Amino acid sequence: MVYYVKIGIGSQYGLAKYLFDFVYDRQIRNLRGSGKMLVFSLNRMSLPADQVLHKLEERGIRINHYAEKYISHPRFSAGQPGEITAAVVSLEELGLENGASLEELFRHIQGTPFRPCPPDTGFFLRLAWTDQPQSGNSILTGTHRSPDQAVTIRSEILVQDDAFPKGLYLRKVDGELWLRGYVCDPAYHFPGETLFAFETHRT
């Protein structure tokens, strides 16, 4: 089963949820049919970095310095405006029970309906997804693990430098919504329970 959510900014789209039967695409050979995924339809607009940061502040969404650095990159909002579909699914549901690095994950989704999201997907998803489940682990210093209930946006790498953020992730802590950037080296192994968002299409 899949939860499908139609989302946009402002009054363009109301927030509605639909539960419908989903037949997994045969191309996703390793995806276990017993699971669930969230599918979001997002209306993307081309916004400069200062407007993105202002909108986040206006909505009371917290960010870290890695997120600000990522958002300020010239390629962050360089894509064409329009509607995209993003799916949130765990590595386990993709058949990666033991987890994967970003490169292993990229290779694993080749030939499936999943592909990396445009860099600004996390921004639009964060504005819309206000009822994200709460994270249980609010303090993560020194853990080097993905936060509980966090969703990592699998987007293209903007800069081939391990000191530059690889992307964004969404979490909700103590009732506050966050959009955070993260850094990791190529060898970092995301656990199997990690939730990722990909661009996809409905089958």
Question: Where are the language model's segments positioned?
Answer:
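A binding-site-centric feature that preferentially detects glycan-recognition modules on secreted/surface proteins
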Residues: 1-203
